[in-house]
A protein has these predicted regions:
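Flexible glycine-/small-residue-enriched beta->alpha junction loops
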Residues: 1-3
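Glycine-rich phosphate/ribose-binding loops and adjacent secondary-structure elements
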Residues: 9-181
Length: 182
């Protein structure tokens, strides 16, 4: 709501630790009749310890997001200056999954700064089972391109190329909206 600070990263109110998380995963699995894979997404911070804990919860995959990823939701200091570089996070995450005996049962997915095939090859060579491409794919779709009809500073309050209004449904280039006019 307007005037209320957003908490980013957000905290889920239903769990405070690994035991609560395992219960929540079981609850979701029951609600979906086990038909939907359950993935945990973790920011790369205390990678080894966090992944070890996550691997014991019953999830199907663990998604590690390195500090090179992008989000319009967090303060600039958090998005640009915190976290573990992704390449270092992959080895720690793979070792944690291996150490708890979940190799082959839990997939390791990595995202954060994947820009090209070389980055994909490095991630897989270091132990990722798959990679996710977010920001690069958005840029390839022309996200944040300057459009002559958009008054970014007047309408959005930001300069062209710094929109980050994906969550509003007002994407002026049409990448993150369901509005046919945009």
């Amino acid at each position: 709501p307007a005037g209320i600070d957003q908490r980013s990263p957000a905290r889920h109110p239903d769990w405070l630790g690994p035991d609560d998380l395992a219960l929540k995963i079981e609850e979701i699995r029951e609600a979906t009749d086990g038909q939907i894979p359950i993935q945990l997404k973790l920011g790369a911070a205390r990678v080894y310890d966090d992944v070890r804990m996550a691997a014991k919860t019953g999830c199907d995959s663990i998604y590690i997001d390195g500090m090179e990823g992008g989000t319009g939701a967090g303060p600039l200091l958090a998005t640009e200056e915190t976290g573990v570089p992704g390449i270092a996070a992959i080895r720690q995450a793979r070792r944690a999954i291996d150490d708890v005996g979940m190799t082959g049962r839990i997939s390791l997915i990595y995202a954060g700064g994947i820009r090209n095939g070389g980055d994909v090859a490095k991630a897989v060579a270091l132990g990722a089972d798959a990679v996710a491409i977010g920001h690069s794919a958005m840029m390839a779709l022309n996200c944040n391109r300057d459009t002559p009809e958009a008054d970014y500073e007047g309408e959005m309050g930001v300069k062209a190329g710094e929109c980050y209004h994906c969550h509003t449904g007002r994407c002026t280039v049409g990448v993150a909206t369901q509005d046919p006019e945009l």
